[in-house]
Curated annotation (Swiss-Prot):
NCBIfam families: rplA_bact (TIGR01169). This is Large ribosomal subunit protein uL1. Belongs to the universal ribosomal protein uL1 family. GO terms for molecular function: rRNA binding; structural constituent of ribosome; tRNA binding. The keyword Ribonucleoprotein applies. Part of the 50S ribosomal subunit.
Length: 234
């Protein structure tokens, strides 16, 4: 049997696997256990009441978290003309068309999000095998293929998170850093859950948000009592 590290022993002793923690208690516990030498991310896993095998029940979208993610997001934009100037003014890091496509083909991809105007998809479409596996392919469902590229850039820079369920019907994404204030993490989580509820497929029956767990990069998952959250849409 593998020997538990000191960190793993502390987590085992502190976290009750079967317990649902109120959000303030859950966040306090994560912060206490976030002892890595770097600032850990706070991640969330949401088990959805969907049949992921059915395409009409899959959930995909994006939402801007009120307190961002704590990451400095680099945005590349495929567009031209006035849209290119608007993208630069909005804070885009790289803007181009064929020239940007050539960079991508060479493996020069120093960016986290790719945005494209509809007229640029003739260029971006050729990059699917490169951008797709990296989760960078622009998609209208998450607002990254849009005529309003400036807004998409601002959203990405402001801390927009994209989400889609995996084959087990679970959403995995980030809601910030362990260095965030407790209320910031709570409000980010609540904003994400509100967005997910709005994205509930009409064909999904029964309880939609079945389980919500939060964890840090190096820590254990803590299940959150949803009754301690405000997930009513305004």
């Amino acid at each position: 049997m593998a020997k538990l590290t000191k960190r793993m022993r502390v987590i085992r002793d502190k976290v009750e696997v079967t317990k649902e923690y109120e959000i303030n208690e859950a966040v306090a516990l994560l912060k206490e256990l976030a002892t890595a030498k770097f600032v850990e991310s706070v991640d969330v896993a949401v088990n959805l009441g969907i049949d992921a095998r059915k395409s009409d029940q899959n959930v995909r979208g994006a939402t801007v978290l009120p307190h961002g993610t704590g990451r400095d997001i680099r945005v590349a934009v495929f567009t031209q003309g006035a849209n290119a100037e608007a993208a630069k003014a909005a804070g885009a890091d790289i803007v181009g068309m064929e020239d940007l496509a050539e960079q991508v083909k060479k493996g020069e991809m120093n960016f986290d999000v790719v945005v494209a105007s509809p007229d640029a998809m003739r260029v971006v479409g050729q990059l699917g095998t490169i951008l797709g596996p990296r989760g960078l392919m622009p998609n209208p469902k998450v607002g990254t293929v849009t005529p309003n590229v400036a807004e998409a850039v601002k959203n990405a820079k402001a801390g927009q998170v994209r989400y889609r369920n995996d084959k087990n019907g679970i959403i995995h994404t980030t809601i910030g850093k362990a260095s965030f204030e407790a209320n910031q993490l709570q409000e980010n989580l609540e904003a994400l859950l509100v967005a997910l509820k709005k994205a509930k497929p009409s064909s999904a029956k029964g309880t939609f948000l079945k389980k919500v767990s939060i964890s840090t990069t190096m820590g254990a998952g803590v299940t959150v009592d949803q009754a301690s959250l405000d997930t009513q849409a305004n």
